[in-house]
Amino acid sequence: METHHPGAFLLPSYSEMKSSGCQFPTHTPFHKLNPSVLGCHLPSGTPHCISDILSRPLPASHSGMFPGYPTVQGYGSSSVPGTCYGEQGNILTKSGTPYTNQSQGGWTDIEQDWRGGNPALSSASNTEGSSRKKHTRPTFTGHQIFALEKTFEQTKYLAGPERARLAFSLGMSESQVKVWFQNRRTKWRKKSAVETPGLPSLSTRAPGDLIPSDNEDDEYSKPLDPDSDDEKIRLLLRKHRAAFSVLSLASHNL
């Protein structure tokens, strides 16, 4: 009856060891063997002996450390098989010609756009900046225009406190109220000049008739303070009352 020892199937039989040509005594322990004895005299094509393993040439994958034009494989290799690196670090094809910038992923073009700026974006930003610089006319609501017109019917000029109070009540700035009154006065003067063409001339005018001159009109146009300019307001109203009476007589005669 044969006795089967554990792990015996892992060791070659004596006949196999003898046929393989390895020559060492069977009674000598394996760890006490001379390394020269382990170098089996196998045929040149057998890759199992230590001498054959040590005498093998280095694989082609490790030859990248040497100069030349090695094929890049493994870590950091190119996705294109057969791609090589030259001495200057540029990528070469199989034929030895370097890749163009476009074949390397187009990074050069992106870098140029990043450094030089995108002309489309720069033109758009310039257009936006120019549109912001354009002066836009202020728009007023119907309520604001109605209040301004009613105030203009009462007085053609506003003093500083009145202008500030009106601007605050309408939610406007003082400059907007001031400009609106300036434009409205200009329109009112033009309209008054067109509607009163039959005014008596200087030759037909009575000596006591008072027609407001340009200086008087300028005096009337100046802002008045109701608290300190009472006498000035009284004189201006008297002059303009006489002028209005002359205008009313001229209209009745027509």
From Swiss-Prot:
Keywords: DNA-binding, Homeobox, Nucleus, Transcription, Transcription regulation. InterPro entries: HD (IPR001356), HD_metazoa (IPR020479), Homeobox_CS (IPR017970), Homeobox_NK-like (IPR050394), Homeodomain-like_sf (IPR009057), HTH_motif (IPR000047). GO terms for cellular component: nucleus. It is found in: Nucleus. GO terms for biological process: cell differentiation; regulation of transcription by RNA polymerase II. One of its GO terms (molecular function) is DNA-binding transcription factor activity, RNA polymerase II-specific. Residues 112-140, 191-228 are annotated as: Disordered. Residues 133-192 bind DNA. Putative transcription factor, which may be involved in patterning of central nervous system and pancreas. This is Homeobox protein Nkx-6.3. It comes from Xenopus laevis (African clawed frog).
